[in-house]
Amino acid sequence: MSKANLVIYVISDSIGETAEQVAKAAVSQFKTEDYEIRRFPYINEKRQILEILEEAKNENAVIAFTIVISELREFLIEEAVHLNIPYADVITPILSAMESVLEIPAKKEPGLIRKLDERYFRKVEAIEFAVKYDDGKDTRGLKQADIVLTGISRTSKTPLSMYLAHKNLKVANVPLVPEVAPPRELFEINPKKIIGLTTNPVKLIEIRQERLKALGLKNEANYASMERIFEELEYADGIMKRLGCPVIDVSTKAIEESAGIILEIFKEMGHKFSNGK
C-alpha cells in the first residue's frame, strides 16, 4: 500500500475531537484528498507519545494535538522538534490569550468539555423525566425519582418539578385529591425523598379563581370554593402525616425560594441524589 500524501496524527489527553475537527478544517483549504487522519485519544504518558512519534517519523506526518498538561505538552514538542516532525498545538494559544484577558490561570484538566456535555445531557434527561412523571401520570417513576412532590392542585408541583429538573434532579409529582386514593407507590418509597406542598386557603382561592377565569369558567365552580379548599387541605395534611414527610408552605414563596428550601432540607438530611450531588 502506498503512503498517503499527508498523515495527520491527532494526539489528545481527552478524546481528540477538537484537534481532529481543526485538522479537517485546515486540510480542506488544500486541493488534496490524499490524506489520512489517525487519532490517538487519552494520551497521558510520555511512553505513549514516544510510540506515536516513532511511527509518525516514517510518514509524511503533521501532528495536531490538544494536551493541556504542561509536562506532557512540552515533552511532545521537544520530541517532535528532535524528529523534525511539524506540529500544531491546537489549544495552548487560545488558552494563553484567555489567561491574559481573564488574569487567572486555566485549570488545565483534560476532558472538561466532555464533562460539560455530560451535565447537559443529564439535564435533558431530568427535564424529560419531570414531563413524563408529572401530575401522577405514571407512578412507576416514583421509585426512580430523586425527589417526589405531593400536594393538592395549584400548589406549584409542576413548576417546582421543572425548576429542579434544570438542576439535573429527577422529580416526580403526585396530586392529592380526596376522591382518589394516593398511589400505593407513594407509601412504598423512602419518605425522606418526599416533600409535601401546602398553601394558605385564602391565597389558594385567589389562584384557583384566576385559573377558572383563564379557562372561561365561572368562579362558582366547586373547585374554587372555600369549603372545597379546606376539604382538600385537610385531606392532604392527613396523607402527609401518614407519610411522615417534610411539608413546605408555598403561599408567599417564589418557585426559586421553595426550590431552595427543598434543596436545603435534603442537604440537612445528607441525601445524595442520582447526579452525585
From Swiss-Prot:
Keywords: Kinase, Nucleotide-binding, Serine/threonine-protein kinase, Transferase
Reactions catalysed according to its record: N(tele)-phospho-L-histidyl/L-threonyl-[pyruvate, phosphate dikinase] + ADP = N(tele)-phospho-L-histidyl/O-phospho-L-threonyl-[pyruvate, phosphate dikinase] + AMP + H(+); N(tele)-phospho-L-histidyl/O-phospho-L-threonyl-[pyruvate, phosphate dikinase] + phosphate + H(+) = N(tele)-phospho-L-histidyl/L-threonyl-[pyruvate, phosphate dikinase] + diphosphate
A GO MF label: protein serine/threonine kinase activity
Transmembrane segments annotated in the record for this chain: none
One Pfam family matching this protein: Kinase-PPPase
EC number(s) stated in the UniProt entry for this protein: 2.7.11.32, 2.7.4.27
Top-rank taxon, per record: Bacteria
EC class name: transferase
UniProt-listed InterPro entries: Kinase-pyrophosphorylase (IPR005177), PPDK_reg (IPR026565)
Residues that, per the record, bind ADP: 151-158
Family of this protein: Belongs to the pyruvate, phosphate/water dikinase regulatory protein family. PDRP subfamily.
PANTHER family reported in the protein's UniProt record: PYRUVATE, PHOSPHATE DIKINASE REGULATORY PROTEIN 1, CHLOROPLASTIC
Role noted for this protein: Bifunctional serine/threonine kinase and phosphorylase involved in the regulation of the pyruvate, phosphate dikinase (PPDK) by catalyzing its phosphorylation/dephosphorylation.
Entry protein name: Putative pyruvate, phosphate dikinase regulatory protein
